[in-house]
């Protein structure tokens, strides 16, 4: 947790391409239960109902959710502190790549709420065994650390997770309701 706070503070002091006013607009939009469109920079009404596909583009720091092939909503995300390479072993701080399923909802997460991603696959377990390493696990889509929700959209200024995909708590509230267990998730670089 101390590392998370230090990274956020450093990134805020160092400056970034998004202004304080823009973060305020994003947080106000999300707090009103609406969706921030990162492409247009506008607040929009969000579609109701469940989604059937999640796509995470690691290089763009963007998570998109779909229903019936139609884009429903996009989220700016923070990723693993270990860089853009695919997850290879436990503790590397990287986000895995591949196609998975959401396997469970966790209402008691240390990060507001979370959705467990079905990593590792049998193939990833076998590949890790051949390398003589543990593939790791506990990969989630989650909110901000408990009692740190005030950070809001600013959390995306730095990759701070241990290999998970992080969104704001308000965004996580929406995802938690809209994403059923079994939903396919594709993670690419």
Walk through the language-model features, giving the residues of each.
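Exported/periplasmic cell-wall-interacting domains
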Residues: 50, 96, 104-189
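Short Gly/aromatic-enriched secondary-structure transition segments
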Residues: 70-82
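Disulfide-braced loops of extracellular cysteine-rich modules
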Residues: 25-30
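C-terminal motif of bacterial Sec signal peptides marking the signal peptidase cleavage site
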Residues: 14-15
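Bacterial lipoprotein signal-peptidase II cleavage site
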Residues: 18-24
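Extracellular, cysteine-rich, disulfide-stabilized repeat modules with beta-strand cores
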Residues: 34-38
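Sec-dependent signal peptide recognition
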Residues: 2-9
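N-terminal post-signal-peptidase region of extra-cytosolic proteins
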Residues: 44-53, 58-59, 79-103, 122-127, ...
């Amino acid at each position: 947790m101390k590392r998370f706070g230090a990274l956020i503070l450093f990134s805020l002091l160092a400056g970034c391409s998004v202004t304080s006013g823009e973060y305020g607009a994003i947080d106000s939009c999300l707090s009103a239960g609406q969706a921030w469109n990162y492409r247009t920079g506008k607040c929009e009404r969000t579609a109701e109902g469940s989604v059937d596909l999640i796509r995470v583009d690691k290089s763009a720091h963007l998570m998109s959710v779909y229903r019936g092939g139609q884009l429903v909503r996009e989220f700016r995300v923070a990723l693993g502190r270990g860089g853009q390479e695919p997850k290879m072993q436990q503790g590397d701080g990287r986000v895995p790549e591949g196609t998975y399923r959401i396997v469970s909802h966790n209402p008691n997460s240390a990060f507001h709420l979370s959705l467990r991603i079905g990593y590792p696959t049998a193939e990833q377990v076998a590949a890790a065994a051949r390398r003589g390493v543990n593939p790791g696990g506990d990969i989630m889509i989650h909110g901000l650390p408990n009692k740190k929700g005030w950070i809001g959209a600013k959390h995306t200024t730095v990759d701070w997770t241990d290999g998970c995909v992080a969104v704001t708590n308000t965004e996580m509230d929406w995802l938690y309701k809209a994403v059923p267990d079994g939903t396919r998730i594709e993670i690419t670089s």
